[in-house]
């Protein structure tokens, strides 16, 4: 009898459920969105119950459509870095505080500068930053004492879901390694990190491998989801590490680059490793597979800003003609030669995570002359996003013990031929676009196949995932980028103090409004 597998990806803007055949073909996918509550510049929260209902209803839509298809297991992918404070009655004291919430910025700075933060990073693998639960919980225990005094647990969104399903507080090693509080070598909570956070191990969930299987789901919830309560649930991992699995970037030297709204670059190694300069993360996939890399804030949001602020007339024409506005932007960029005639754009419109880990950095054009036109600025912005990812790539290659063999490119940007070729030229590497568009859900299911013993290694992934586009570097273009890249990198270093000064000035404008 043919069996099927269900991958569920709990994301920041929506939850996706995808039903796959066991050879990786998509049978059906469902998605339910939910709001991100941002009442001010620093707050980014969600309602955990809305997310739980999205998990139930995406699954129910699929099982209702395919009642005859036997689901052999359900496996989970989840966004990282969320925090929910829970009281002694297992009820939330806070909304779900997401990775994008910056209210713990002051505590992240204090941990980094005064509380031995770099040594904590080297043991835990998560750069000290407001995104990390370590910073968020330290902020709650020190500045929100009315919450901390009632908090029995601090959990993430996947832990909240599994508590509803199985009445247990459990966290997989992958999500735990993204908290800033798990010792990578000991696979246990780090004493010093917990001391900084102001909590004990009892405040956190039980640590389990990403391959841990749960059964005996709550009968009431199983009915709502349309599944057998004995269906195996694989706890799974974080969306980032599973994306590498889902695009077949798992062998030594293979790198996955994703650009959606934000972006990331990652590779898999066989044992945990951190960076002496603190530029990259190290998260668990399994005990033999660890993912190192860096996330960037400024991906597609830069293109959206260019679209809205620089190209309103072109976009209006595109809309009337039924053409995708982003296709128009990339066509405009094609009119300019690589390097934008010496115009550089630092794409830091939303601060930046890797490799700078500085929320105060700001965007800028450099090299403007009278001969530069709008199309130069558009191309420079596209190039700036890739330049920035390349600086993360350089940090990553310093931590790898061999050469890069290929780059797997995914996310919205992979649909643009201009951007794909630009990446190949700047990175001076072959760029391949895999056939998978649901990489985190597929990655969760591949991990599920491994957990349930249906495959004994991840080598089977290559049979599931073909490729659609392949680009190799154009030497003349690569030469231009080789000349400009050191200028791009040096500028961001030289402006470090000025970034802080201008960010302070901008914050002052907000408080005086």
From Swiss-Prot:
Gene Ontology annotations of biological process type: D-gluconate metabolic process
Pfam families according to UniProt: FGGY_C, FGGY_N
Activity regulation remarks: Catabolite repression by gluconate.
InterPro entries attached to this UniProt entry: ATPase_NBD, Carb_kinase_FGGY, Carb_kinase_FGGY_CS, FGGY_C, FGGY_Carb_Kinase, FGGY_N, Gluconate_kinase
CDD domains tied to this protein: ASKHA_NBD_FGGY_GntK
Enzyme Commission (EC) number: 2.7.1.12
PROSITE patterns: FGGY_KINASES_1, FGGY_KINASES_2
Molecular function terms, GO-annotated: ATP binding; gluconokinase activity
PANTHER family named in the record: GLUCONOKINASE, SUGAR KINASE
Similarity field: Belongs to the FGGY kinase family.
Protein name: Gluconokinase
């Amino acid at each position: 009898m043919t069996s099927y597998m269900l991958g569920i990806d709990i994301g920041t803007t929506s939850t996706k459920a995808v039903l796959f055949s066991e050879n990786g073909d998509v049978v059906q996918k469902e998605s339910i969105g939910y709001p991100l509550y941002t009442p001010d510049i620093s707050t980014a929260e969600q309602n955990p119950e809305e997310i739980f209902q999205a998990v139930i209803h995406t699954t129910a839509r699929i099982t209702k459509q395919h009642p005859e298809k036997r689901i052999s297991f359900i496996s989970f992918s989840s966004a990282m870095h969320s925090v929910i404070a829970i009281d002694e009655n297992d009820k939330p004291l806070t909304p779900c505080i997401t990775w994008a919430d910056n209210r713990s910025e002051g505590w992240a700075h204090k941990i980094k500068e005064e509380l031995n933060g770099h040594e904590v990073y080297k043991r835990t693998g998560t750069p000290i930053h407001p995104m990390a639960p370590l910073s968020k919980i330290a902020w709650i225990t020190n500045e929100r004492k009315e919450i901390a005094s009632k908090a029995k647990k601090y959990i993430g969104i996947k832990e909240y879901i599994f508590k509803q399903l199985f009445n247990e507080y459990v966290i997989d090693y992958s999500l735990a390694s993204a908290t800033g509080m798990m010792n990578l070598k000991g696979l246990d909570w780090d004493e010093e990190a917990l001391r900084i956070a102001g909590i004990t191990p009892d405040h956190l969930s039980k640590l389990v491998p990403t391959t841990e299987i749960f059964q005996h789901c709550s009968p009431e919830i199983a009915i709502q989801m349309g599944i057998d309560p004995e269906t195996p649930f694989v706890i799974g991992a974080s969306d980032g590490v599973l994306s590498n699995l889902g695009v077949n970037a798992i062998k030594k030297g293979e790198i996955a680059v994703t650009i959606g709204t934000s972006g990331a670059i990652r590779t898999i190694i066989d044992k945990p490793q951190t960076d002496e300069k603190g530029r990259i993360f190290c998260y668990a996939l399994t005990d033999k597979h660890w993912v190192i890399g860096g996330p960037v804030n400024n991906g597609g949001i830069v293109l959206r800003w260019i679209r809205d602020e620089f190209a309103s007339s072109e976009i209006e024409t595109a809309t009337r003609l039924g053409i995708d506005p982003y296709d128009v932007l990339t066509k405009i960029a094609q009119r300019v030669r690589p390097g934008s005639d010496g115009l550089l754009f630092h794409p830091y419109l939303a601060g930046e995570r890797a490799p700078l880990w500085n929320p105060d950095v700001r965007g800028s054009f450099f090299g403007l002359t009278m001969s530069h036109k709008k199309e130069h600025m558009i191309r420079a912005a596209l190039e700036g996003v890739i330049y920035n990812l390349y600086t993360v790539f350089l940090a990553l290659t310093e931590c790898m013990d061999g050469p890069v063999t290929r780059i797997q490119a995914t996310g919205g940007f992979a649909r643009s031929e201009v951007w794909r070729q630009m990446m190949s030229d700047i990175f001076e590497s072959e760029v391949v676009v895999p056939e998978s568009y649901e990489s985190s859900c597929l990655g969760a299911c591949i991990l599920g196949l491994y957990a349930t013993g249906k495959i004994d290694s991840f080598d089977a992934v290559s049979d599931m995932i073909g490729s659609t586009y392949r680009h190799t570097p154009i030497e003349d273009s690569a030469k231009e980028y080789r000349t400009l890249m050191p200028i791009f990198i040096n500028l961001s270093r030289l402006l470090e103090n000025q970034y802080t000064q201008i960010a302070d000035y901008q914050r002052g404008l907000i408080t005086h409004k």
